[in-house]
Amino acid sequence: FYYLNSFFSKFKLKEEEYMKDNAKIEICLEDVESVIRAEKGGADRVELCADLFEGGTTPSLGTFITARRHTTITINTMIRPRGGDFCYSDVEFEAMLEDVKAFKEHGADGIVFGILNIDGTIDKERSRRIIEAARPLSVTFHRAFDMSKDLFQSLEDLIDLGVDRILTSGGEPTVMEGIMNLEKLVEKAGDRIIIMPGCGITESNFSYLKDRVKAKEYHVYLPKEEVSKMEWRPGHIYMGGMLRQPEFQIVHTSEERVKTIVEKK
């Protein structure tokens, strides 16, 4: 009995060490097919958005419900009523609250949002209302954080608000450019809040970033372009504006790329 107990104690310690050393991987995506592929690839969680061309906006409720029906992976939903800045009108904020309630009612695991004042500080009053509406779901403050005036003051504000994690590139366009700030943010945050690096993470830089920053979670976009099945292709018509994506290329999450990242964690 003693040896058996000793064996299980050692096994438990090794399991705890494994969980401590292995970071969680969140995949950023915008469609049901991608959620399915992310789960098959071994991701821990997904951030479900619409319109990643705009940096991610609120997905449709139908997209979320279908993704929830076909997968068991943790799904956090983006709450962002439009592209552009993060200072919202009263009716835009009202829409955000309604979206939080709707996703919560239909089984979302968490929400992702970000609201700033016109001076670049965290809008604490509106953020508090979003968080109250979302609980007990997980709450992530997205890269509006990187657009704030003072990263470290914003960090303290979000900790005071009780936010669970911050998605950030360290106040720079990509994680590799913001790596020094990310190191400082992780150290400053300690166990008070999760700092989740994201934007520009690839299979080739993930291991280096993880070893440097030592974050517990990472946010990754791993697309794969696929050729449309359409045979009839009127090449002179576009659904977008001046900056447009090809109409006959479909972008989904790459299951293979997810597996590659997961193996490195």
Segments and roles (model prediction):
Residues R192-K265:
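C-terminal alpha-helical cap/extension of soluble enzyme domains
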